[in-house]
A protein has these predicted regions:
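Structural detector for helix-capping/boundary residues
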Residues: 14, 50, 62, 107, ...
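ATP-dependent adenylate-forming carboxylate-activation enzymes
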Residues: 20-21, 38-56, 68-71, 187-205
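Conserved AMP-binding/adenylation subdomain of ANL enzymes
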Residues: 133-163, 170-206
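Conserved S/T- and glycine-rich ATP-binding loop of Class I adenylate-forming
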Residues: 16, 33, 64, 109, ...
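Short hydrophobic alpha-helices that are characteristic scaffold elements of the AMP-binding
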Residues: 30-36, 58, 172, 180-184
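Conserved AMP-binding/adenylate-forming
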Residues: 2-47, 166-167
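Conserved pre-ATP/AMP-binding loop-to-beta segment of ANL
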Residues: 96-114, 120-121, 126, 131, ...
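Active-site charged/polar residues at nucleotide-handling catalytic sites that mediate phosphoryl
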Residues: 58-62, 81, 204-206
Length: 206
């Protein structure tokens, strides 16, 4: 929050684009943008440059946070948006904000996501706090059912933590919503940045 406030004066309602693989910093920047009053824009980093250029042009971000990896159009991205391009971990030397107050209305824009573009040019989907969290109830019910299953089908001395292993990218709504639902219930959320590492990651979890 502190970093974003310094990087974007009067941040309320301003767009912050996230262009990165799944990582810890993705979650930090998503929460930070929302708490600072900005709008999170999740982008598919593996789209072609014409597709990305079109989407970035639509949202007109004040800042683009990215992982620095070249997915095929790094040179074009730097040439076009170098002045507002920053690393995903730019916040690391900032002090925690101690004066956070919620100034966002339930129907104010909070997240912008894009469709896949499989049926024509991708479209921006505008999500307010209210409609973004409409699926939260269903997610919590699902988690509760998993806990019930654990207690009725597994030995009580098997102290497993209810967890969700996400292999979808965080620009996908199905995974992005998990950032907000699972941790706040005390459940573990494991993010994979590459499906090819699935079995390695599962082994590391045990």
């Amino acid at each position: 929050v502190t970093y974003l406030r310094g990087a974007i004066p009067d941040i309320k309602g301003k767009r912050v684009a996230l262009l990165s693989k799944n990582c810890y910093e993705y979650g930090v920047n998503a929460f930070g943008t929302i708490l600072a009053g900005g709008v999170v824009v999740t982008l598919n980093q593996k789209k072609t440059w014409p597709e990305l250029e079109y989407e970035i042009g639509l949202v007109e971000p004040s800042l683009i946070l990215n992982d620095g990896i070249d997915y095929g159009c790094r040179d074009q991205l730097v040439a076009a948006y170098g002045p507002i391009l920053r690393p995903m971990d730019s916040f690391k030397d900032s002090e925690p904000a101690m004066d956070i107050t919620n100034t966002r209305g339930h129907d104010d824009l909070m997240v912008l996501m894009f469709t896949s573009g499989t049926t024509g040019r991708s479209k921006a989907v505008m999500l307010s706090e209210r409609n973004f969290f409409t699926t939260t109830g269903a997610q919590v019910v699902f988690g509760g059912a998993m806990l019930d299953y654990k207690h009725t089908h597994m030995p009580e001395n098997k102290n497993d933590v209810l967890s969700n292993f996400c292999i979808l990218p965080l620009f996908h709504l199905g995974t992005f919503i998990c950032l907000f639902v699972w941790p706040c219930k005390g459940w573990a959320l494991n993010l994979s940045s590459d499906l090819r590492d699935f079995y390695r990651d599962v082994r590391l979890m045990h």
